[in-house]
UniProtKB/Swiss-Prot annotation:
It is found in: Secreted. It comes from the Eukaryota. Its main location: secreted. This is Locustamyotropin-2. It comes from Locusta migratoria (Migratory locust). Belongs to the pyrokinin family. Mediates visceral muscle contractile activity (myotropic activity). One of its GO terms (cellular component) is extracellular region. Signal peptide: none annotated.
Amino acid sequence: EGDFTPRL
């Protein structure tokens, strides 16, 4: 929550 890191 907070930063959005697009990880599969």
